[in-house]
Amino acid sequence: MIGRYGGPDKRRSPRHDRRFMATLEYQGNTHEIRTIDISEHGVLIPKRLPPPIGTCVKLTLTIRNEASEFEGVVTRHTRCLVNGVESVGVGIDISSNEYREFVKNKILIA
């Protein structure tokens, strides 16, 4: 099956187009970003200079002025569109049960 941005679709759960403020931290750097999409297993974010695949990251998602912090791993780089402009998307796998509950209880109802 072909994914949304032309590559193979390897998703374990459906994507939800949701734009939330997020803070990405890795290798001593902090970046303020917005999500492109979210699933129960991770997020896709835009990043012009993406961290290498395999990089451990900390992602803080802010929804309705409430911040929640999760740890994940960069699993892929892909092409994506952000406001009609082609960009690099960074797929971050977040495999904690807390994150899945967060998505079910906060994201899907937002």
Where are these regions (language model features)?
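Short, solvent-exposed secondary-structure boundary/capping segments
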Residues: L44-K47, T78-I94
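Short, conserved charged micro-motifs
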Residues: I53-T55, R100-F102
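N-terminal helix initiation/capping motif
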Residues: M1-I38, E101-A110
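Short conserved beta-strand and strand-loop elements enriched in small hydrophobics
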Residues: F20-L24, G54-S68
